[in-house]
Amino acid sequence: MKKYNKDNIPNELLEAAKFISEDKLKKAEPILRDYLKSDPLDVNAMKLLADIGIKFRAYKDAGYLLIRALDLSPDYDPARLSYANLLYKRQLPFEALEQISILLEKDPTNIQYLTLKAVNLALANQHDNALEIFEIIIKEKNVVNNQLHLSYGHTLRAVGRLDEAIESYKNAISTKVGYGEAYWSLANLKTFDFTNEDINEIKSLLSNKDCKIDDYYHLLFALGKAEEDSNNFESSMAAYVKGNSIRSKQVPWDSREFSLECDEIIDFFDEDLIKKFKDVGDKNTDPIFVVGLPRSGSTLIEQILSSHSLIEGTTELQNIIALSRKIANKKNSSSKSEYPSALIAMDKSQFKEMGAAYIKNTLDQRVTDKPYF
């Protein structure tokens, strides 16, 4: 691994780092790509480019870069930390925990490593272990950080300690003025009531021209809930509409394109296709899962089914989504998806491999008191 000091850092890396610090990622990306063409073994450049990829949700490319960097330089801890963060964002907590364990062996009291371990334990439904770490960081090490208090609040909420969750969200707000996500987390508890003073405070924060966009739309959603609870329905709807309008500019969404994709999937998976693929795939009968759409009632169905003594409920899993993305084989956001058409060209062995991989990758989620699988 190349070691740089202030006198020998390549100009390209300095320029890219400057753009990254200014959040001008689209300017930094081509600089790093061009630099890596001339020096393909520079793990520092790989890590910087991977971090940009993570922010753009180009997880496949970012993962390749970080794995390559760690192959070349296993002791490059910043790259390993980025890789652990990537795995967390991909909702692969057990894989992330493996990377974090390597980091903690070297630096067992590192707050950043411990925090990342805690949030991954929470993601893996190991809430008690996560809370233990959060409480060491917050109560024993006296670390003050808005994101830390927010994550701690989420974990407290998951185990039903709602009063403590509220306190933690309020601590997050006191740590960072105008922290929109914490206000929205309070609103999303459904049991928390904003006071008139709270509502006026949110309105004041929204009028601040320095309010960042992420805070802004979260504050609008919180205001919408607060006004709704106060029966000010017109003001509530106005806040929700404005918040969603702002949020929609950050999330790539084309309703017409989505409708066409749904129509294509419905037409593709017809009776003839199902008959053709009847005997392919992994023969294991382990998983019981409900496939549905957000806001369609599938969560309620899952809750009803999982109350049965022989059915095991997990959490919302990303494995099917990840599998469909793998089949889609999109190189970037503008390239055409190969899903579902690519299924036609697959042979029986590929279906069996995908089924077996699904079983394997969901085993870690089976941590309830009904281990029938």
Region locations from a protein language model:
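Alpha-helical solenoid repeat scaffolds of the TPR/TPR-like class and their adjacent stem/linker regions
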Residues: 1-365
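Conserved two-lobed SF2 helicase motor
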Residues: 371-373
